[in-house]
Amino acid sequence: MSSVIRKWALTALMAVSSTALFAQNPAASGQAANQGDNRRILRVDITGGISQPMPIAVPVMPTPSSVETLAGTTAVLGRQVASVISNDLKSSGLFTPSQQASLHNVSFPEVTAPQYSYWLSSGAQALVQGFVQANGDGTLTVGCYLYDVFASQEMLHKGFVVKPADWRRAAHKCADAVYTRLTGEGPYFDSRIVYISETGPKNHRLKRLAIMDQDGANHRFLTNGQSMVLTPRFAPNQQTVTYLSYVGNSPRIYVYTLGSGHVRLVVNKPNTTFAPRFSPDGKTIVFSMSVAGNTDIYKVPVSGGQATRLTTSPGIDTAPSFSPDGSKIVFESDRSGSQQIYIMNADGSNQNRISFGSGRYATPVWSPRGDLIAFTKLGGGFHVGVMKTDGSGEQILTNGWQDEGPSWSPNGRVIAFFRTARNSGHTELWSVDLTGVNERHIPTPLDGSDPSWGPLLP
């Protein structure tokens, strides 16, 4: 863990051992897995689709004593942490949290000794309890426990030490631990989204680079809107963002460092450059550049230097995206007469078309799991869909009037995109899971477009 948030051995409660307990891997399939003692452990199987979300209780987290911190009292933070955890789990579409106000007030000793009979009568199948404690050095400790109500047993416990200002990160980490333990899937709640904030009339939009947590919290603007910005993309290190900006009315690719606010020009050429994206190792940026009326895909070291041309077709080649291992690139091209999806080796060799459905395809993005490619489907509207890397198994996930610009969550189970309203023209950020059932609006202060979902934070 980083210095911002670190795991903590839960020694604050006498019933807990001095080392953190890590959950066992769930069984490969089924609603539950048999353990050595023949008790059945809860499991949410998300591969076959969810007919009924799991009832789960996340009561207010108690504190040994209410202490004032820079982020409020620990008593207030206990309520807020529980609320964030509950909202995270609900947003996945896999869980139905009980209404917090209707739940039993958990005392501090009860954190490690749940009243199973009460929680069983409440209808909850799983229980998330914890605590918030102020430390002498000004930090907070947030404890996180998951219990199987039916089996009356603990499934995991973890703890996180954070600065008071970072209490939401501890909540997201707890939700991630619960999600992973119950589904077997990787976490994604403790992550951020960078996007384009928009305001103003259609013919004179003010566009600013902005960043926020994946749930819309901790929002801040990164640019002032003096120059138009487009297509931000996170680096694998979570510390930098590449994007297109019209400084001096000339589109150029830049890299923005989140910690310092430093901005650096990547490709210093008079040609139009756009659609940048980092390689998985963060050492290369792949992008499109127009030369003599022809648009092809190039790559350049992040530090700058000579750009290498990867495609040479007479059409428009753009929107490149690396495979997770960096060996291949998916991109869109109209070389066949309409926008379609192609895959090539990272050096530009072996270019092959993979999309053959009706309509046109744009903005392909490789899943971090490596198994799917998300895209925008154009035909009777704009829709977000996925296909396998050989082009088979195409599935349309959204049915809005204009849904586009997909970006994968860190675990490859959820896709962020932006939606344009038919009548008003307003743009909003949304997410959808791979079933296409669980759509979620991502709140932003103003209109939003071009989301880029960053990697999981350390």
UniProtKB/Swiss-Prot annotation:
Signal peptide positions on this chain: 1-23
Record's subcellular location: Periplasm
Pfam families, A to Z: PD40, TolB_N
Keywords: Cell cycle, Cell division, Periplasm, Signal
Family statement drawn from the similarity comment of this UniProt entry: Belongs to the TolB family.
Function description: Part of the Tol-Pal system, which plays a role in outer membrane invagination during cell division and is important for maintaining outer membrane integrity.
Subunit (UniProt): The Tol-Pal system is composed of five core proteins: the inner membrane proteins TolA, TolQ and TolR, the periplasmic protein TolB and the outer membrane protein Pal. They form a network linking the inner and outer membranes and the peptidoglycan layer.
Name this protein carries in UniProt: Tol-Pal system protein TolB
Originating species: Zymomonas mobilis subsp. mobilis (strain ATCC 31821 / ZM4 / CP4)
